[in-house]
């Protein structure tokens, strides 16, 4: 239970930091909700406004250690706002201060109980919506802005509907009218219409706002920002989570490469020209009498695949058909790891020497990902490396590189991972996959990958043990167990 002096101090801090807290409330809520809808990482039912009360409690030095104690202090704080005259006698100046901020009290209580804004923007009238936008984007100012004119506005509900419908955003047939040579001459950038550019710009603006929220918390001296956000939403912020996800993808598929090399006993030094995934010919072992398949190109590369046609309408080479078959597996919920392994076994699809950490996002990659049914699974930011501000870039992408889906088989694997943890794409789930692979790896490069994932976690304040079992020690224990079993078998042959 909080004492009267503690409650008084909480109110003083809340009043002193009122404007900044209001701005942080709204910006954090809209960033988590709007940006997370586009990225597909967060759940909407996670409560976000507890951070506001946590900030006040942290300012006055009220300890919050366990979940039970945190809930009790939060409940006491909310009860004080809800009924200041109940239970204890409050000085008149505290009552007057509470009445003065009655709007804040109602807003906080409703947000804590419902986890959302009291008046949904869908149900609000235009006037109320304009007033809300003014408060959200310019707290303390009277300069009203029309909906859509404010560059800091992230997503409207209509924008999200359009973002999840590929044909409404990108009309490929309309955009690609004319001769094929003219279309190729224009380049990929010209294939994006104005609406999609606006949507991606809003995503970038939303990510930049998260960085501003980081800076604002540091300026206020709140303390461990990450712990506050994590305690309220069970997720890190959008921009930190994106960085970790992309780093993980690179680690995950690099481990796949290493496991394939170990299984096939391939020496990296023997590779004269380590090319990319789709620069190798495929020989189908199931049809021994057939000639080797023609060396194929990636779907959509150069003019082999016409941009104006959908993937299922194009005549594919045998190699491309194998790649496209992986696309078709996703809709039926098949085990992509098992399917991919079978395809690799049948078609000799070795990826040795492929550097997943060197990939950069590019318009051609985005165009491939934004086609039709893939749009709802891969809502990526367009050209974020070139266009995002320096402050966001340094925070989100330490190495200024971002992993992308050059390979449709990689795209299929990642989509399978996404489907597995659809509701909550948690970091722990992904790192557990790395743990599983690390335990079976027998190459020294695993330490490098282990350090890379660990460094990312440390940069974002995540105290997480990547692999609590030493790899070399595990190998020695396995050998010891095998020797003991052989000894017992020899001593007892029957």
Curated annotation (Swiss-Prot):
This is Uncharacterized protein ORF114. The lineage of its organism: Viruses, Duplodnaviria, Heunggongvirae, Peploviricota, Herviviricetes.
């Amino acid at each position: 239970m909080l004492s009267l002096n503690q409650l008084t101090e909480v109110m003083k801090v809340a009043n002193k930091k009122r404007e900044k807290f209001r701005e942080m409330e709204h910006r954090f809520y809209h960033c988590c909700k709007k940006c997370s809808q586009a990225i597909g990482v967060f759940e909407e039912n996670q409560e976000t406004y507890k951070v506001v009360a946590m900030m006040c409690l942290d300012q006055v030095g009220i300890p919050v250690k366990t979940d039970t104690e945190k809930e009790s202090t939060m409940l006491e704080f909310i009860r004080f706002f809800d009924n200041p005259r109940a239970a204890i006698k409050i000085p008149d100046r505290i009552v007057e201060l509470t009445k003065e901020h009655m709007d804040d009290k109602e807003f906080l209580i409703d947000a804590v109980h419902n986890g959302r804004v009291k008046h949904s923007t869908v149900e609000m009238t235009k006037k109320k919506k304009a007033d809300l936008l003014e408060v959200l984007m310019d707290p303390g100012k009277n300069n009203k802005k029309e909906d859509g004119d404010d560059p800091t506005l992230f997503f409207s509900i209509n924008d999200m509907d359009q973002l999840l419908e590929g044909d409404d955003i990108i009309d490929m047939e309309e955009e690609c009218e004319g001769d094929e040579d003219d279309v190729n001459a224009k380049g990929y950038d010209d294939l994006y219409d104005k609406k999609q550019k606006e949507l991606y710009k809003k995503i970038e603006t939303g990510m930049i706002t998260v960085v501003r929220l980081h800076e604002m918390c540091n300026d206020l001296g709140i303390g461990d920002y990450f712990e506050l956000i994590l305690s309220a939403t069970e997720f890190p912020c959008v921009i930190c989570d994106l960085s970790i996800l992309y780093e993980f993808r690179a680690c995950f598929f690099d481990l796949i490469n290493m496991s394939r090399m170990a299984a096939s006993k391939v020496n990296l030094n023997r590779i004269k020209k380590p090319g990319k995934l789709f620069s190798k010919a495929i020989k189908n072992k199931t049809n021994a009498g057939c000639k080797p398949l023609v060396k194929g190109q990636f779907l959509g590369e150069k003019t082999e695949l016409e941009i104006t046609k959908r993937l299922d309408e194009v005549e594919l080479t045998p190699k491309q058909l194998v790649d496209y078959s992986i696309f078709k597996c996703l809709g039926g919920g098949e085990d992509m790891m098992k399917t991919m392994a079978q395809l690799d076994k049948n078609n000799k699809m070795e990826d040795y020497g492929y550097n997943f950490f060197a990939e950069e996002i590019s318009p051609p990659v985005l165009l491939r990902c934004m086609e039709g049914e893939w749009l709802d699974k891969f809502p990526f930011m367009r050209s974020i490396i070139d266009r995002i501000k320096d402050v966001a870039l340094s925070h989100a992408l330490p190495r200024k590189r971002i992993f992308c889906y050059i390979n449709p088989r990689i795209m299929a694997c990642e989509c399978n991972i996404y489907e597995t943890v659809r509701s909550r794409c948690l970091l722990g789930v992904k790192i557990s996959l790395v743990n599983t692979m690390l335990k079976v790896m027998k190459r020294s490069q695993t330490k490098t990958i282990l350090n890379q994932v660990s460094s990312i976690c440390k940069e974002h304040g995540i105290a997480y043990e990547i692999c609590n079992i030493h790899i070399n020690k595990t190998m020695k224990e396995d050998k010891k167990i095998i020797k003991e079993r052989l000894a017992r078998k020899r001593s007892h042959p029957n």
